[in-house]
């Protein structure tokens, strides 16, 4: 069976850097940080009091006020990003064969804010009995964002959610890619969303000592590949990529951002939260994606790394890149856009895939910000080009995106310039 080709024809994004793909990409290229003191709850007693929040978003510009109240914030963000993506791809909803269009979205946690609100209320007022909101369960469950997107547009194709912690939306893109190239759909609205900046989310990650506590300087807290890194910065947001079968896209005259050419998955099988210290799973997943794409290491010009700004994770990923890419590792660009967006958890893979697509389209690599001279980690090889502090213009023929999740889940996707 000859596999069909898959292209990216639309983008959507709501992130700490901007409420559209254009705003987000411009801020990435400029090296802006989305970190600031937390506004969504009183974090004054928490070890970490800052995060990368979505800012200045009026949800009711996109979603009817009454409907918005039925949605957890993560679902609101997912639906808005999907609306942007579908609009951007230029699909005629009146004539489209909606039976051949699906939705595959990734979510790492789901409606944790809704869960916190409902359970906290009951815990404070048990004498009132179990008076739960009838939308408690539908707002909370992790699969509901893809369901709302499908319902909103009337898409009857494959519809489900992938959940693999921080690899969730990369797994969603991989599944969407495979559904299309196997001929099971013409178009998939894919991506991911997360919004867990609440007491449970921040408190839980604080208890694990996973978050940066640089409360006096939030904008410089996320600093992947620097010796003074002290944990990741929590973020929220959503990203959407419209993946489409090439001939279907050409037939309707769609613009094409890039071609998706490969994906890979692997497991560390090592620890519930820590990366394998030698980067075993990272090595396996990049090798799998390259093989799937039919590309050699020297064909990749940019790697958007998982790069969360944790001690073990950054070192192990850099080791894996050197092992997989050999001499080519020193000729490509590496960057972590988490230095700007923070860690978007289940949405990370989608937003970082978008960064890869736009890097391929525009021949520019966004930076890894916040590195300072003299802040080198002796366990890292700075012969690698981490694209510190300033975007770099270069030809980007193909870009690879890594995402790794708690539980040892690893996923990788590759995009390249579209050519007939």
Predicted regions and their residues:
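Acyl-CoA/ACP chain-elongation machinery
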Residues: 39, 184-230, 263-277, 307-315, ...
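Condensing-enzyme catalytic core mediating Claisen C-C bond formation in acyl metabolism
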Residues: 5-9, 36, 216-293, 302, ...
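ACP-dependent fatty acid/polyketide chain-elongation machinery
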Residues: 1-67, 89, 247-259, 354-368, ...
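Active-site-proximal alpha-helical scaffold in enzymes
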Residues: 78-91, 145-146, 150-153, 159-194, ...
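Glycine-/small-residue-rich "gating" segment that lines the acyl/pantetheine channel
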Residues: 124-133, 174, 178, 194-251, ...
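Flexible, low-complexity linker/loop segments at domain and module junctions
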Residues: 1-8, 95-98, 293-299, 330, ...
């Amino acid at each position: 069976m000859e596999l069909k080709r898959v292209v990216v024809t639309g983008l959507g994004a709501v992130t700490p850097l901007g409420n559209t793909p254009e705003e987000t990409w411009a801020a990435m290229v400029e090296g802006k940080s989305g970190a600031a003191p937390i506004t969504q709850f009183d974090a004054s007693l928490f070890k970490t009091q800052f995060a990368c929040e979505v800012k200045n978003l009026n949800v009711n510009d996109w979603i009817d006020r009454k409907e918005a109240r039925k949605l957890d914030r993560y679902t609101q963000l997912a639906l808005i990003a999907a609306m942007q993506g579908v609009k951007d791809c230029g699909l005629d909803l009146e004539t489209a064969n909606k039976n051949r269009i699906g939705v595959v979205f990734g979510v790492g946690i789901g409606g944790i804010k809704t869960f916190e609100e409902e359970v906290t209320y009951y815990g404070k007022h048990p004498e009132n009995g179990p008076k739960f909101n009838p939308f408690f369960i539908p707002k909370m469950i992790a699969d509901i964002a893809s369901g709302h997107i499908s319902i909103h547009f009337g898409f009857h194709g494959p519809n489900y959610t992938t959940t693999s912690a921080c690899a969730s939306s990369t797994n969603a893109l991989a599944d969407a890619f495979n559904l299309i190239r196997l001929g099971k759909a013409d178009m998939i609205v894919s991506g991911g969303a997360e919004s867990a900046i609440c007491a449970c989310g921040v408190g839980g990650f604080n208890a694990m000592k996973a978050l940066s506590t640089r409360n006096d300087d939030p904008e410089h807290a996320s600093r992947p590949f620097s010796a003074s890194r002290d944990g990741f910065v929590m973020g929220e947001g959503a990203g959407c990529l419209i993946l489409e079968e090439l001939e279907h896209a050409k037939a309707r005259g769609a613009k094409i951002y890039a071609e998706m050419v490969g994906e890979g998955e692997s497991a560390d099988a090592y620890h519930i939260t820590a990366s394998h210290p030698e980067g075993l799973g990272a090595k396996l997943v990049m090798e799998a994606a390259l093989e799937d794409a039919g590309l050699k290491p020297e064909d990749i010009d940019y790697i958007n790394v998982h790069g969360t700004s944790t001690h073990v994770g950054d070192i192990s990923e850099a080791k894996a890149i050197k092992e997989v890419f050999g001499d080519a590792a020193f000729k490509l660009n590496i960057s972590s856009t988490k230095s700007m967006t923070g860690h978007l958890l289940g949405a990370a893979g989608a937003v970082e895939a978008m960064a890869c697509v736009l890097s391929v389209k525009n021949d520019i690599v966004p930076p890894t910000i916040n590195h300072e001279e003299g802040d080198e980690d002796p366990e890292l090889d700075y012969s690698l080009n981490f694209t510190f502090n300033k975007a770099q213009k270069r030809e980007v023929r193909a870009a690879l995106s890594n995402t790794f999740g708690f539980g040892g889940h690893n996923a990788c996707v590759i995009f390249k310039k579209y050519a007939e």
